[in-house]
From Swiss-Prot:
GO molecular function, a single term: homoserine O-succinyltransferase activity
InterPro entries: Class_I_gatase-like, HST_MetA, MetA_family
Protein name: Homoserine O-succinyltransferase
Catalysed reaction, written as an equation: L-homoserine + succinyl-CoA = O-succinyl-L-homoserine + CoA
Organism name: Shewanella sp. (strain MR-4)
Catalytic activity, EC: 2.3.1.46
Parts of the chain that traverse the membrane: none
Swiss-Prot/TrEMBL keywords: Acyltransferase, Amino-acid biosynthesis, Cytoplasm, Methionine biosynthesis, Transferase
Length: 313
């Protein structure tokens, strides 16, 4: 949250140059406050686990957040009871007439399947298109990030020979962006995917900005220049055990997976896993919710034209 300071205080310029969020008394006096309304499109098989992971991050912010859970209507969930889905999830027809402050679209275990071959691809496209007029900011995670970049900007992914799984070091490629406030120069984030985006294509695209990358895992944080779409190529929401669970699931299916890199102590899958990314994940979601949702969204959600983007940097 911002520090409110007197108008024209000399420290303001210094703090802003250090990427510290300050707000003048004049601006603070004109702020209206209400709960943030966030919609989560949950595409992961274990709905309850993913709900918990995302709500854990959203709940660690100082803002009050009202959450709606969204499903693909005609897609059966094999790992979550129909009672749970009918009780807690909405269909798109229930929300298409609404506006939201934020939308989170999760990853999906669709690996090497072409986007056009995904059985519910038309539903994904429809929801993404809808979000560009009805949501202040959209957070795309892992598979959803690739899908969003493909649908919105025509950028396709490259299929990897081996699944990229592990916890990798990342660095900021830009300094003075609200999303990166409080980030260390280097930080860890988990990845679990069968594909990657061409980082040079991302950097050369006039409507996109690469904010963080990894020598081992490639592009990590990509932001659209209108600040509406944030593409996160990894899984900052994962809990400590998730990569381990996925590794043993793949072993049981005879897929001969590589051991997740930089995850187990001494890279020994019989040893304990080390969670190095939780503080980063918490800060990332907090910054997104504060700077790209709360600070930009209109008080009256019926008026999405009232949104005032950050100046492109």
């Amino acid at each position: 949250m911002p520090v409110k300071i007197p108008d024209h205080l000399p420290a303001a310029g210094i703090l802003e140059s250090e990427n510290i969020f300050v707000m003048s008394e004049t601006r603070a006096a004109n702020q209206d406050i209400r709960p943030m309304k966030v919609l989560i499109l949950n595409l992961m098989p274990n709905k309850i686990e993913t709900e918990t992971q995302l709500l854990r991050l959203l709940g660690n912010t100082p803002l009050q957040v009202d959450v709606d859970l969204l499903r693909i209507h005609d897609k059966e969930s094999k790992h979550t009871s129909i009672d749970h889905m009918n009780t807690f999830y909405r269909d798109f027809e229930d929300v298409r007439h609404k506006n939201y402050d934020g939308l989170i679209i999760t990853g999906a275990p669709l690996g090497q399947i072409d986007f056009e071959e995904v059985t519910y691809w038309d539903h994904i496209r429809e929801i993404i298109d809808w979000s560009q007029q009805h949501v202040t900011s959209v957070l795309f995670l892992c598979w959803a990030a690739h899908a969003g970049l493909y649908h919105l900007y025509g950028l396709n992914r490259k299929i990897l020979q081996q699944k990229r799984s592990g916890v990798f070091v990342h660095r900021r490629t830009c300094q003075h962006f609200p999303l990166l406030r409080g980030f260390d120069d280097e930080f860890f984030a988990p990845h679990s995917r069968f594909a990657e985006m061409d980082i040079e294509e991302l950097k050369q695209h006039p409507e996109l900005q690469v904010l963080a990358e990894s020598d081992e895992a490639g592009a990590y944080l990509v932001l659209s220049r209108n600040n509406r779409n944030l593409f996160v190529m990894g899984h900052p929401e994962y809990q400590k055990s998730t990569l381990n669970d996925e590794y043993h699931r793949d072993l049981a299916q005879g897929l001969n997976p590589n051991v997740p890199q930089n995850y187990y102590r001494n890279d020994d899958p019989q040893a304990d896993a080390i969670a190095r990314w939780h503080s980063h994940g918490s800060l990332l979601v907090s910054n997104w919710l504060n700077y790209y949702v709360y600070q930009l969204t209109p008080y009256d959600l019926s008026d999405m034209t009232a949104m005032t983007p950050w100046e492109s940097q």
